[in-house]
């Protein structure tokens, strides 16, 4: 795997990931943004997130990994379909204030900040102790929590990279994805292919070997419930309906 594949698509993110340490003055010139990297299931979102975390940490920069409690796959870990996994730093509920949680976690027990001349002081701002926030399955966040991620980027000056899918198995958008599409500075589609070879854009739910198009919006793939990424043509052929009609 290309060691830069997790961040190569956005030049400004690449500059952050390859730039100076959190303790250097040059870091303060960075302009932080909220990024949304989305795609159908099996498009490599979790793999990309884990690669991005590795790229930052290889440069001695600090990251914070987040996922929603409702995502029970892997329990407290981000798990890619390649078998790579990593424990997250924060599991969040729908009523959690993400900015407050991130600040509390990152600043708690942070190492003293080195000033010019060798003097040390206690860290008081998030950007002094954190280089990037990474969110897996960001579609499970609330719209308010996405706004809080934007505040981390704009107010705390820390880049936020959110990975997730746009729509559920009925082609209805998730609240978190909808808000990310509305306000994120940068949108990047991660592509995968349908069984027919076309680009997959929908996530079809299966129970056993049969496609289903009714049920709760959230059903984590495990046991009998699985998902298949389909193009629009194959989605309709399988019995799917375009819910906007």
Residue ranges and their predicted role:
Residues 140-141:
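Residues immediately C-terminal
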Residues 26-113, 117, 168-179, 189-192, ...:
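Conserved P-loop
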Residues 184:
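Short basic (Lys/Arg) and small-residue
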Residues 193-220:
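Short recognition patches in nucleic-acid-associated and regulatory proteins
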Residues 133-134:
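Walker B beta-strand of ABC/ABC-like P-loop ATPase nucleotide-binding domains
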Residues 52, 144-152, 176:
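A short acidic, amphipathic alpha-helical/loop segment
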Residues 137:
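Walker B catalytic acidic pair
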Residues 153-176:
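Sensor-1/coupling segment of RecA-like P-loop NTPase cores
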